[in-house]
Amino acid sequence: METNDLGFVATLLFVLVPAIFLIILYIQTNSREG
């Protein structure tokens, strides 16, 4: 299985973007309650 740079970046973005979005939501809800 060859590692493609574009595929690697796409996979990285596909994983990181929702994770960052959830972290931002989590921080916002915590700051509102606190």
UniProtKB/Swiss-Prot annotation:
<comment type="similarity">
    <text>Belongs to the PsbM family.</text>
</comment>
<keyword id="KW-0812">Transmembrane</keyword>
<keyword id="KW-0472">Membrane</keyword>
<dbReference type="InterPro" id="IPR007826">
    <property type="entry name" value="PSII_PsbM"/>
</dbReference>
<keyword id="KW-0674">Reaction center</keyword>
<dbReference type="InterPro" id="IPR037269">
    <property type="entry name" value="PSII_PsbM_sf"/>
</dbReference>
<keyword id="KW-0793">Thylakoid</keyword>
<dbReference type="Pfam" id="PF05151">
    <property type="entry name" value="PsbM"/>
</dbReference>
<dbReference type="GO" id="GO:0009523">
    <property type="term" value="C:photosystem II"/>
</dbReference>
<keyword id="KW-1133">Transmembrane helix</keyword>
<feature type="transmembrane region" description="Helical">
    <location>
        <begin position="7"/>
        <end position="27"/>
    </location>
</feature>
<comment type="function">
    <text>One of the components of the core complex of photosystem II (PSII). PSII is a light-driven water:plastoquinone oxidoreductase that uses light energy to abstract electrons from H(2)O, generating O(2) and a proton gradient subsequently used for ATP formation. It consists of a core antenna complex that captures photons, and an electron transfer chain that converts photonic excitation into a charge separation. This subunit is found at the monomer-monomer interface.</text>
</comment>
<protein>
    <recommendedName>
        <fullName>Photosystem II reaction center protein M</fullName>
    </recommendedName>
</protein>
<keyword id="KW-0602">Photosynthesis</keyword>
<dbReference type="GO" id="GO:0031676">
    <property type="term" value="C:plasma membrane-derived thylakoid membrane"/>
</dbReference>
<keyword id="KW-0604">Photosystem II</keyword>
<comment type="subunit">
    <text>PSII is composed of 1 copy each of membrane proteins PsbA, PsbB, PsbC, PsbD, PsbE, PsbF, PsbH, PsbI, PsbJ, PsbK, PsbL, PsbM, PsbT, PsbX, PsbY, PsbZ, Psb30/Ycf12, peripheral proteins PsbO, CyanoQ (PsbQ), PsbU, PsbV and a large number of cofactors. It forms dimeric complexes.</text>
</comment>
<dbReference type="GO" id="GO:0019684">
    <property type="term" value="P:photosynthesis, light reaction"/>
</dbReference>
